[in-house]
From Swiss-Prot:
This is E3 ubiquitin-protein ligase TM129. Residues 1-6, 78-94 are lumenal. It is found in: Endoplasmic reticulum membrane. The gene is tmem129. The lineage of its organism: Eukaryota, Metazoa, Chordata, Craniata, Vertebrata. The RING-type zinc finger domain is responsible for E3 ubiquitin ligase activity. It catalyses: S-ubiquitinyl-[E2 ubiquitin-conjugating enzyme]-L-cysteine + [acceptor protein]-L-lysine = [E2 ubiquitin-conjugating enzyme]-L-cysteine + N(6)-ubiquitinyl-[acceptor protein]-L-lysine. GO terms for molecular function: ubiquitin protein ligase activity; zinc ion binding. It is an enzyme of class 2 (transferase). Residues 28-56, 116-361 are cytoplasmic. A zinc finger (RING-type) spans 285-349. It holds the Pfam family Tmpp129. The chain crosses the membrane at residues 7-27, 57-77, 95-115.
Length: 361
């Protein structure tokens, strides 16, 4: 890794990946197309459609420049390769330069084609024209969307590279290279999948991501998927004019407590199993009286002395009720601390943490 060309290659690959997929650190530092060219792009709040037409065009141009940018950088990182003079470079580098140049020229030609006829050739404009009335154009649809986007009661969720926006009339998904649009009265939404993550990327809290497919009765409108947190599901329902179908029978956890309960159960199942002494019968859980007690509190964690305490109670609670008790004793304003906190036993008040909850065999 002492070679300058190897160091530059590694650094450029990391930079290119971050520039394309844009993590929060890059976005905060302003290394995004939207931030660097904000004056030319215009305000998203004022001209939403025009802003994203320009943004997607610039994004294609800059992302297609990355291969050529690597070649230019290597001209300085590896001067012994004679890359400054293409005809002196090796055949492999000549082919790479030619391919990079073709990619850049094609992207420029594509951007020029999109800009013709007042951007009418742009994919976003073509998608809007599908919803235009016979005597109208995509500009009328764009004007409607721009007006509704300026309202404060719109629903907006997700990262900038996959943002979901729902206004009074439109369901939209903003991606890196495109904008998907569907009309409320024409579309039908269906829950198709959900994924539960013990920790979200942004906060130290559990999160459930729900995938919803947006279809349309208009055959010219392509269906698309939107993803949002389960805690935002109820807000989305309020904004829509039609119910959301749950074709996959997905269980959606609408509150943080419900999400935490699933995470609590998954962690407890990884703990040490407690074997009941022979002859001991398990009684129904005193919390729900629906199932037998199936967890026992044992001080097994490696915490500092005086933190967790040994509980001498017999098994009296099921895993679900113990999880609900654990969640109910937390600071509701700081969910990121729930997994690492300690709560008193519901019966004897001995403090325990999540590592002390053992499933019963």
């Amino acid at each position: 890794m002492d070679r300058p060309d190897a160091t530059f290659t590694l650094a450029y690959v990391v930079f290119a990946l971050c520039f394309v997929f844009t993590p929060n650190e890059f976005r905060s530092a302003g290394f995004t197309v939207q931030h660097m060219f904000s004056e030319w792009l215009g305000s998203e709040d004022i001209s939403f459609i025009q802003h994203h037409i320009r943004r997607t065009t610039l994004t294609v141009l800059f992302h297609s420049f990355l291969p050529l940018g690597y070649y230019i950088g290597m001209c300085f990182a590896a001067p012994e390769q004679n890359l400054m003079y293409v005809h002196h470079a090796s055949q492999g580098w000549q082919m790479y330069f030619g391919l990079s140049l073709v990619i850049q020229l094609l992207s420029c030609a594509l951007a020029f084609y999109w800009s013709r006829r007042g951007w009418a050739n742009h994919p976003i404009c073509k998608a809007l024209s599908v919803h235009a009335l016979p005597q109208s154009s995509w500009r009328a649809v764009a004007s409607s969307i721009n007006t509704e986007f300026r309202r404060i009661d719109k629903f907006a969720s997700g990262s900038p590279s996959a943002r979901v926006i729902v206004t009074d009339t439109w369901v939209m998904k903003v991606t890196t290279y495109s904008l998907h649009v569907a009309l409320h009265q024409d579309c039908h939404l269906t829950v198709t999948d959900s994924k539960h993550h013990s920790l979200s990327p942004d906060l130290n809290t559990p999160v459930q991501i729900v995938t919803i497919t947006v279809g349309s009765i208009n055959p010219r409108v392509k269906s698309f998927d939107i993803r949002l947190k389960s805690t935002e599901y109820a807000e989305l329902q309020e904004k829509l004019h039609a119910p959301i179908r749950n074709a996959a029978n997905v269980v959606i956890h609408l509150t943080m407590s419900e999400l935490f309960l699933e995470t609590f159960k998954s962690y407890v199942r990884m703990n040490v199993v407690y074997k009941c002494p022979s002859g001991q019968e398990l009684e129904p859980c005193i919390g729900c009286m629906q199932v037998n007690a199936n967890v026992k509190l044992l001080c097994l964690c490696q915490s500092d002395e005086g933190e967790c305490q040994q509980c001498y109670c017999r098994p009296m609670w099921c895993l679900t009720c113990m999880g609900k008790w654990f969640a109910s004793r937390q600071d509701q304003q700081q969910p990121e601390t729930w997994l690492s906190s300690r709560v008193p036993c519901p019966t004897c008040r001995a403090k325990f943490c999540i590592l002390d909850v053992c499933p019963i065999e």
